Amino acid sequence: MQDWTSECDLLVVGSGGGALTGAYTAAAQGLTTIVLEKTDRFGGTSAYSGASIWLPGTQVQERAGLPDSTENARSYLRALLGDAESERQDAYVETAPAVVALLEQNPNIEFEFRAFPDYYKAEGRMDTGRSINPLDLDPADIGDLAGRCVRNCTKTDRMDHAPGRMIGGRALIAVSAAVQSTARQNFAPESVLTSLIVEDGRVVGGLRSNPRYRQRIKANRGVLMHAGGGFEGNAEMREQAGTPGKAIWSMGPSGPTPATRSPPELAGRRRNSLARSGVVLPRGRAARRRRLHGRVRGGLVVDSPGSVPQRVASVRPVRTSHGCSPDDNGSAVPSFMIFDSREVTDCPPSASRTRPPPSTSKPEPGSVPTLSKNSLPRPDYRPERIAQHCRKVQRCRKLGVDEEFHRGEDPYDAFFCPPNGGANAALTAIENGPFYAARDRLSDLGTKGGLVTDVNGRVLRADGSAIDGLYAAGNTSASVAPFYPGPGVPLGTAMVFSYRAAQDMAK
């Protein structure tokens, strides 16, 4: 017999958008929940995101008059991902409308469509995008929870947002207010799930630890929902998975460094896929502003060791904007983005020369040949190669055609590029000094590797059987998509499979 300290129907580990969706779904079914958050603030990794959510075919797209549908979304995923995860792909797109319908029943939660193109040219793609976003939130609407949300990414607002509003991923804290309104929850900050409690092969609870005490929490349904972040902040686990880059380069919050001891029969973790790149702070921690690539039209990214230009205005592909695949193990970094003064002027203040952001390395002015020789700290960088490629960009600008990288031919390119007076808005010549180089390293916001699950989020053993009572979603689980089909797929899948897990537990 276990000596239990507290009880609930559903124990939720983590407080990001996916975890909170699972908690709210359970509460809506009449189940009691305890939400454990490792840090002292709620919101998780999703609070650091722009909160685009890839939930296709919902009432939100219908309100916006978009010709979106579950079938179109299914076709798009199948064209990109194949049949390897067809059941989970189907569960994802078929459940998305129900998730949104449930959440919008609560007066605290409302979504809207915001244009952001799907990333790849494939059957079912929507050039306008199909992602939805939570409406900006007035902190007064959620009371004390506003002060318990993950803090702003930076101390200074550089994007002219309305003062006092909770925007982007922080607006998803509204889901926690919805959970709280059910009176069937208990939020527990500064609480680490240090181990799972197993009886006769079934997960029946967990050991909660915080700076003051330890508790044995029983899930009355014999259920634990594990949605507590990935392993991007754990250097040892990254090395075991063969994940490129360093833990200190991750852009995620400090919480996702798994401390839970799992039953030995758990399935192994899948190999992580590199999701994106970012600018790195001088002190080594990844910068919170990650849109430099999207804002610079006329740049070159030169990688190691041969000064090879890489595409700047680009979708988020299987290969990163460095031209480095996950199998390259990060050998192409650091890279340097080279651009001229017009891009500095046109960039938002987060990448401004006159107001350099304190959270990124300051660009270095100088002529292109001088810059490449004196400022790019690798002996194998060749100034003549960089100058040659700058002249090539000039020719592309005059022609309006990028024959090598095809910039400006994809709707995603056009989305980020306002008119520049030329035939191709994605091409701006590198000719107006001073010139700049921004150091670029691999980075990530989370992991795609994790616990292998079925369509209802049940964690699977190595032999494919389900572990009774254990569910996983979000960055804890292996992704349904080995790469990034569109804006908000990680958050969308986290919400859908947390919803499906809670529904399965409520049966």
UniProtKB/Swiss-Prot annotation:
<feature type="binding site">
    <location>
        <begin position="9"/>
        <end position="38"/>
    </location>
    <ligand>
        <name>FAD</name>
    </ligand>
</feature>
<dbReference type="InterPro" id="IPR050315">
    <property type="entry name" value="FAD-oxidoreductase_2"/>
</dbReference>
<keyword id="KW-0274">FAD</keyword>
<dbReference type="Pfam" id="PF00890">
    <property type="entry name" value="FAD_binding_2"/>
</dbReference>
<keyword id="KW-0560">Oxidoreductase</keyword>
<dbReference type="InterPro" id="IPR027477">
    <property type="entry name" value="Succ_DH/fumarate_Rdtase_cat_sf"/>
</dbReference>
<keyword id="KW-0753">Steroid metabolism</keyword>
<comment type="pathway">
    <text>Lipid metabolism; steroid degradation.</text>
</comment>
<keyword id="KW-0443">Lipid metabolism</keyword>
<keyword id="KW-0285">Flavoprotein</keyword>
<comment type="similarity">
    <text>Belongs to the FAD-dependent oxidoreductase 2 family. 3-oxosteroid dehydrogenase subfamily.</text>
</comment>
<feature type="region of interest" description="Disordered">
    <location>
        <begin position="299"/>
        <end position="385"/>
    </location>
</feature>
<dbReference type="GO" id="GO:0005886">
    <property type="term" value="C:plasma membrane"/>
</dbReference>
<dbReference type="GO" id="GO:0006706">
    <property type="term" value="P:steroid catabolic process"/>
</dbReference>
<protein>
    <recommendedName>
        <fullName>3-oxosteroid 1-dehydrogenase</fullName>
        <ecNumber>1.3.99.4</ecNumber>
    </recommendedName>
</protein>
<dbReference type="GO" id="GO:0047571">
    <property type="term" value="F:3-oxosteroid 1-dehydrogenase activity"/>
</dbReference>
<keyword id="KW-0472">Membrane</keyword>
<keyword id="KW-1003">Cell membrane</keyword>
<dbReference type="InterPro" id="IPR036188">
    <property type="entry name" value="FAD/NAD-bd_sf"/>
</dbReference>
<dbReference type="GO" id="GO:0008202">
    <property type="term" value="P:steroid metabolic process"/>
</dbReference>
<dbReference type="InterPro" id="IPR003953">
    <property type="entry name" value="FAD-dep_OxRdtase_2_FAD-bd"/>
</dbReference>
